[in-house]
């Protein structure tokens, strides 16, 4: 049969070398459309919005089929770059995929997005790093290059390979460091967490029975509400500001490792 293309989208081309999956919404309707002899699949609600040329003029197209999002789940596709092995490069369902923006099909690079990472853990597809903690690529044609310097080049190279259907430029918000103004890169890395759920009741009890607050309304006000809503606490801080964790480790005169946690 004819080749069919899943029309996925991203605002972060630098994450594409780490792509290991695509996500659709199982409850959305998708259309298979024919444009200039090529077949593309995207959310039905977005067909007219997406099928425009680079001057935002409507393209001629033919709808050749309709699918439910769940019909796409389990399909495999050819990787953009390296083959990431077993269970990679498949389509999964995710309820956070919508028809508000993009194409209704989302590119997934698990180590560079919180929702992507959660889905990868749930469905057991690979999560791979292509960028080190300083923002430099560790593999491929861009090895040693800074992520922001090659962001546009990645998109252009894929366009030349015939993989990118369209490059568009939009203005959208992006997180920056409020201290130095540099762009932030979301990147997963091994960390230690404190199990807050496992000791939430004890923390609430200590807050009520042991700690004296000044002013007193903080006890059952802001602080208690913080405890009730707190997620697991990430202890592995990489920040160079704020208060350090008061944990002291060392070896005593007998050669035994000692650890002291300084209380307030």
Regions found by a protein language model. Give the residues of each.
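Protease-associated
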Residues: 17, 21, 28-105, 114
